[in-house]
Amino acid sequence: MATMKDVARLAGVSTSTVSHVINKDRFVSEAITAKVEAAIKELNYAPSALARSLKLNQTHTIGMLITASTNPFYSELVRGVERSCFERGYSLVLCNTEGDEQRMNRNLETLMQKRVDGLLLLCTETHQPSREIMQRYPTVPTVMMDWAPFDGDSDLIQDNSLLGGDLATQYLIDKGHTRIACITGPLDKTPARLRLEGYRAAMKRAGLNIPDGYEVTGDFEFNGGFDAMRQLLSHPLRPQAVFTGNDAMAVGVYQALYQAELQVPQDIAVIGYDDIELASFMTPPLTTIHQPKDELGELAIDVLIHRITQPTLQQQRLQLTPILMERGSA
């Protein structure tokens, strides 16, 4: 593999001149530039990104660590993050933990060793990154998305899940439903707990009772919604409406109702959360709470880059406002 010294020798110039031509950081005459470029082409020379990053102490790379999920929300969020990285001249290294704490910490260590300029974390309270690893790299800026695992200087960006759960439930109440069930996500996740609290707050405000068995814990996945809805259908007092903690579980709810030969919303109204792309293509289109995923991804990258360039800034906690998307399921 050719080196910068090989290019300099062939072009008859110094290595610093080759560096200036490659980096375009100082004037070099057209004649010498042409010689260097010809040598680069002849030797098939590729500049070392590693050497450049060591020299500048910057890799223009951002690491992202997420828990495993087939939930389309995560793929849409990652897409927004990746697009925002590209638009700002950064590369994204994505690591999926698949719920394995050992794998998560190994991935975290790898990202840190690769000298990422910053880190995005989207995990859960029960699967936290190693405090010891994080403390070993105190200068790496970090943005937490949806939750903050431990005290520190990390910035936090989250959806107002409490308000979103309230909005969804109040919409069902305003539609005249009184027997409203809730399928929550895993209660080790702060958004799941807050959406449940929002549901309870709206029910209490309306003076509506929540029968035993009307709150079922799912897993934010398709199967979780399916199993939870089947459980609700076996309840002696079948609910008139269901608030599902995310759209992926709402897909499972639809399937359970289809197999039970029940129609949405004629027999049971359904409202979701996240507003994934699939929501508007379901039959009927899913009424849901919109999370601004592109805005969330863009904001996360902007906050992280701001932290990279100004590391002494005070910690930021930003909250995005959910919006009701009224369609045909409730």
From Swiss-Prot:
PROSITE patterns, alphabetized: HTH_LACI_1, HTH_LACI_2
GO BP terms, alphabetized: positive regulation of DNA-templated transcription; regulation of DNA-templated transcription
Segments of the chain annotated as binding DNA: 4-23
Taxonomic superkingdom: Bacteria
Keywords: DNA-binding, Repressor, Transcription, Transcription regulation
Gene3D superfamilies linked: 3.40.50.2300, lambda repressor-like DNA-binding domains (1.10.260.40)
Pfam families: LacI, Peripla_BP_3
SUPFAM superfamilies noted in UniProt: lambda repressor-like DNA-binding domains, Periplasmic binding protein-like I
Record keyword Calcium present: no
Residues covered by the HTH lacI-type domain: 2-56
One MF annotation (Gene Ontology) recorded for this entry: monosaccharide binding
InterPro entries (UniProt xref): HTH_LacI (IPR000843), LacI/GalR-like_sensor (IPR046335), Lambda_DNA-bd_dom_sf (IPR010982), Peripla_BP_I (IPR028082)
Function, in words: Transcriptional repressor for the ribose rbsDACBK operon. RbsR binds to a region of perfect dyad symmetry spanning the rbs operon transcriptional start site. The affinity for the rbs operator is reduced by addition of ribose, consistent with ribose being the inducer of the operon.
Protein name per Swiss-Prot or TrEMBL: Ribose operon repressor
Taxonomic lineage from the root: Bacteria, Pseudomonadati, Pseudomonadota, Gammaproteobacteria, Enterobacterales
Gene it is expressed from: rbsR
